[in-house]
């Protein structure tokens, strides 16, 4: 397990450098991260590295108990670093909705997030305030790039 944990830490660092170095790679990452806004930046990086096409991910417990969806046989989870359990880090696994199926008539589909155009300016202003960024041309996309650079440098 320690070896796998080290692999995931290294993968997180490698992917963070890759997405920060290339605008094209950054935009691909954002396509994934936009669907996974409840996950931390390092978790989004790992999900992007393993399943860039993921649309909605959750633990097996959430899929089973809240969404009434079962994990398909043979599906492989996406390993994320869990540092919430005290000083020892461990791995936890999440599964994409494509790895699940509904339980008879009970299963639910998750509500996927979407941004309305009016929210773009508010989001850009919020990020500028949170990261002490200068206002730039390019709207929300450029503000997100700046915020990402700041996050990667801090991380």
Give, region by region, the residue ranges found by the protein language model.
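N-terminal accessory/interface modules of nucleic-acid-binding and processing proteins
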Residues: 1-155
């Amino acid at each position: 397990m320690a070896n796998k944990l080290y692999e995931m830490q290294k993968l997180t660092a490698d992917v963070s450098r890759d997405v920060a170095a290339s605008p094209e790679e950054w935009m691909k990452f954002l396509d994934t991260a936009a669907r996974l806004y409840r996950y931390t930046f390092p978790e989004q990086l790992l999900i992007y590295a393993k399943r860039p096409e993921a649309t909605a991910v959750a633990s097996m417990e959430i899929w089973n108990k809240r969404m009434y969806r079962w994990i398909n046989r043979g599906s492989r989870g996406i390993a994320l670093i869990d540092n919430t359990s005290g000083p020892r880090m461990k791995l936890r696994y999440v599964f994409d909705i494509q790895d699940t199926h509904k339980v008879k008539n009970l299963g639910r589909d998750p509500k996927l997030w979407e941004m309305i155009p009016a929210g773009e300016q508010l989001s850009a202003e919020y990020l500028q305030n949170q990261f002490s960024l200068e206002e730039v041309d390019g709207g929300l996309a450029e503000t997100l790039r700046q915020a990402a650079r700041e996050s990667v440098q801090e991380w």
